[in-house]
Amino acid sequence: LSGDYQWQSTVPTDEEMERSYITAESGSMPWVFEKDGTYYMCMEGFPFGRDIYIYRSEKPYGPFTDRTLLFTLPATLDKLGNPYPQRWYMINLHPALSRQGELVFSTNSDPNNFWDNFNRVGSADFYRPFFFRVYNWEHVYDTDTEDDGQTQPDTETEGAE
């Protein structure tokens, strides 16, 4: 390590905790990127949720607000054997794979039973990445909304139903 730092040996104060909040909601695997001077954070609902949310901020370190549902991971996998994963995890954003107007995510899945990873029909389809392309994500904060009050971008799934 280099630079000025110190080991914290006491519980943070309420003020320090408030200062350190990136967002008010919990989640996992956050990814931050910049588009036209606004910073966006995408994050999986916690814990191991199927809902993927997007937030926005004026700064890369937050606070991120305006949580909006970006897309929901499917309940089943497009695979042989048992199509129901125990959970989706490790949502990753791939900016290098994203084209204009889209976001590309990958994620993995767990089987319900650890031993289903081996010598079962479709076992190779667990623990492999599944890719999702989200089109028109820039319009998620537009004022035109659907019946549920949220604008929904278009999602294309590669490897999942």
Language-model-derived ranges and their functions:
Residues 1-161:
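Carbohydrate-active catalytic/glycan-binding domains of CAZyme proteins
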